[in-house]
Amino acid sequence: MLVLLCVDGQTDLSFLDRLQQCGGLQGVTNLTVVPRFTPDVADAVRQKARAYWPDAMPDDAPGRIILLDPRTLPRRHGLHLLLDALCRQTGAVLAFGDDMAIDRHGQVSDPWFKPGFDPLLAARGMLPGPMTALGLDRLRNPLAVWASLRGDNTEPDDPLMTVLAAVSRDEVLHCPHVVAFRFERAVRPRRQIAPPVPDPLPTVSIIIPTRDGWDLLGPCLDSLGRTDWPVAQREIIVVDNGSSDPACLAGLARAEAAGSVRVLRDPRPFNFAALNNRAASLARGELLVFLNNDTLALRPDWLGVLSAFAWLPGAGAVGPKLLYADGSVQHAGLVFGLNGRAVHVHVGLPSDGGGYQGLATTSHEVSGVTGACLALRRAAFEAVGGFNEGFPVAYNDMVLCADLMKKGYRNLYVAEPLFLHLESRTRGNLDNPEKHRREADEAARARALHPDLFAADPHYSPNLSLDAPYVPAVPPRRRPPWDLAGNPSPPAD
């Protein structure tokens, strides 16, 4: 087994002694140190490790290698877990696992139980992690990766990013076990760079169902009127589902006469999915934005932010961070399977609160976003047939997101607080037995449509509980290899 230790000018050379003492390199036959940026230090570490790094990729280069950050200790079984996962998965090029912090007394804390691979998290340095296994013989251009590992480029680069740029997401495998300990308590992410706004700008249709409630809809429309998107390339469609309140009827008439909205009258019994589907079929936008009437836009550039993420390759539903009126988090993505339902996570955090490993303040892939503010390209919406009208009140947004994932789209949470959401003020909360029964029924039918997603949300680690979000599962929901082999416990660390 070959382990590549990536070092820089700040590396403590005693690190190699710690590796050997902890047994983390048990079974390693070749420890090679990658010289990074500082030749003197690289030479010293080379000598201490009694290893070398060839200038050119040799013909007998190993097929499997481990990339190891010097601030990391492998668990005794960690290297083997990664290599085993890489070898078992046909087509996998890179495997990564979970990690925990460790202090100088050997106490562990701060587990980072990771989701499946996510390019947005990888671009921020939160994935893959400090120890990864690489199938060098499976790369289409191994020479470029070899050069990056040696630090041949004029500008220092991250060899992992070079690898990730050369592979597809299906070739990156997550091994959901703690494989390494890190000497830093928390992940220190790079600054997240927002994607560019589409050029040319797409036409946008904003669709808002309502029945009465002008005290909510009026301020919502006022906030949308401050949007900086060109007026000629946006439209607001209000679906009037049988309003009878004079104030609402008068307000809609004024807005329609002013040309600021189109009013689509649809007095059928309330069916959120059907109302939105009909409006979408009559809309002219390339980008569809479904919005509750109890929302308030907080920034004039909100459409630019959402459209930028919606135009990323493979993007499905896109939803921003939503805040309650008091400024705390109402929505920061959905996790499927928690207590058998699809559940909002990070609810109640301060607007700038990081939540679990900073996910609340990091745009990333999720399995679902709320229909209270949901943007997606028309092509993606039509590819799944729109909202499932068998879910008239609840779970229509979650089923839409699940349908998109099944078609290969990726749903995205945008960690920008773009709207206030006065949650369910128009329909009320689930405050009576009938509403509870209906919500439970729609949850059960959603599980029946997408059982695999509710059983194992790919964006939520199996090491995390299904009883409460982002707390460790006891025991973990994924059995480790030694358990499958009939051994009750792992090798001791």
Model-predicted segments: where are they?
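Conserved donor NDP-sugar-binding/catalytic core segment of glycosyltransferases
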Residues: 77-109, 169-170, 295-341
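Short aromatic/hydrophobic "clamp" motif used to bind/position activated sugar donors
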Residues: 65, 288
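A recurrent flexible, glycine/aromatic-enriched loop bordering the glycosyltransferase active site
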Residues: 108-138, 273-274, 281, 337-379, ...
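C-terminal, non-catalytic tails of nucleotide-sugar-dependent glycosyltransferases
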Residues: 1, 186-205, 316, 326-327, ...
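A short, conserved alpha-helix in the catalytic core of glycosyltransferases
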Residues: 138, 150-176, 302-306, 360-385, ...
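N-proximal low-complexity "stem/linker" segments adjacent to membrane-targeting elements
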Residues: 1-24, 180-226
